[in-house]
């Protein structure tokens, strides 16, 4: 048994039911689980946890409005349009309600995005995948992306601040904490200075930082800061962590299959932070088991 949860990311599309997923996880030594944003109400109907513990809910869950639809409609907590923003807040509230119902401690929150032309980021990613990050054309594309983001960021951040204050008040009434997750894409919120802003809104311990190791490494690989900066600046505010590995920009590998500096990660993780293995379903059960053992060896996870 381990002090780490297994995300349903590894189960959706692989098992017929959540019960089957929990059973498979238990066979691998898991007693804790995170429900992610691919779990809808139909999957939850009649669910018997049978003693399994849900430690965290990754919004939007239940995903009756899929994440893709929320993004396409800009129904996000960062939306400048008030109706869209309220729809985004409502989606997170549904996840808070579910956390309260299931006894989860934390809702993992995506704080939205900066509304810019995402083709700017796609162009940069394409150059990276072509092996051209040291060429002038990459630096130029990166500069265009950063400038576009900077010109728009405060407009979206105003909406995020307002949304977060509302959500923190709602979550506090249910005894739920909100973990603001660092994101994979550069145009998404937050960057480190934005996270510092959001963690100091006056929401107290209700709002903390949820560190995603693969996302931080992806941004470093693209040339946007360092992975360690997130941990150094916000290590004391970490309430949870998504553990997965990455090669280049290909993330959600089982730990040990990529290039994450796990010794560095382990140095910063608070003992009481929730830990979740967020491995994609392309990882075999053998790779998953080996990944957890790797995390134990590196000091990121404890065997109980």
Each predicted region: which residue ranges?
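N-terminal small/glycine-rich loop or linker at the start of catalytic domains
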Residues: 1-9, 56, 63-77, 137-144
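Histidine-acidic metal/acid-base catalytic patches
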Residues: 1-4, 8, 12-26, 41, ...
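Short, hydrophobic beta-strand segments that form beta-sheet elements in well-ordered domains
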Residues: 6, 29-37
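Generic detector of well-ordered alpha-helical packing
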Residues: 35, 59, 182-183, 213, ...
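Glycine-rich, proline-tolerant flexible connector loops at the mouths of alpha/beta enzymes
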Residues: 36-56, 117-118
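Conserved beta-strand edge residues that scaffold enzyme active sites
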Residues: 39-40, 61, 113-114, 185, ...
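Short loop/turn segments at strand-loop or loop-helix junctions that form parts
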Residues: 58-62, 109-114, 244-245
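Active-site acidic/histidine proton-transfer and metal-coordination neighborhood
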Residues: 77-208
């Amino acid at each position: 048994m381990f002090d780490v949860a297994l995300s349903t990311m590894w189960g959706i599309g692989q098992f017929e039911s959540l019960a089957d997923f929990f059973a498979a996880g238990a066979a691998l030594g898991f007693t804790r689980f995170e429900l992610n944003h691919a779990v809808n109400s139909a999957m939850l109907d009649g669910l018997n946890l049978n003693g399994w513990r849900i430690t965290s809910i990754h919004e939007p869950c239940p995903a009756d409005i899929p994440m893709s639809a929320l993004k396409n409609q800009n129904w996000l907590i960062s939306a400048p349009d008030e109706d869209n923003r309220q729809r985004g807040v409502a989606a997170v509230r549904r996840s808070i309600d579910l956390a309260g119902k299931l006894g989860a401690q934390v809702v993992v929150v995506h704080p939205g995005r900066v509304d810019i032309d995402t083709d700017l980021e796609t162009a940069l990613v394409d150059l990276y995948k072509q092996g051209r990050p040291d060429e002038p054309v990459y630096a130029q594309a990166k500069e265009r992306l950063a400038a576009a983001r900077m010109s728009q960021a405060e407009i979206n951040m105003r909406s995020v601040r307002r949304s977060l204050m509302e959500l923190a008040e709602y979550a506090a009434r249910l005894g739920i904490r909100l973990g603001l997750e660092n994101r994979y894409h550069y145009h998404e919120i937050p960057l480190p200075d934005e996270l510092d802003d959001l963690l100091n809104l006056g929401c107290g311990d209700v709002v903390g930082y949820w560190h995603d190791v693969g996302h931080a490494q992806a941004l470093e690989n693209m040339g946007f800061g360092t992975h360690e900066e997130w941990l150094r600046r916000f290590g004391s505010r970490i309430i949870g962590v998504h553990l997965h590995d990455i090669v280049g920009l290909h993330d959600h590998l089982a730990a040990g299959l990529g290039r994450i500096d796990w010794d560095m990660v382990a140095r910063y993780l608070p003992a009481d932070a929730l830990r979740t293995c967020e491995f994609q379903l392309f990882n075999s059960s053998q790779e998953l088991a080996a990944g957890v053992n790797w995390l134990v060896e590196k000091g990121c996870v404890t065997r109980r």
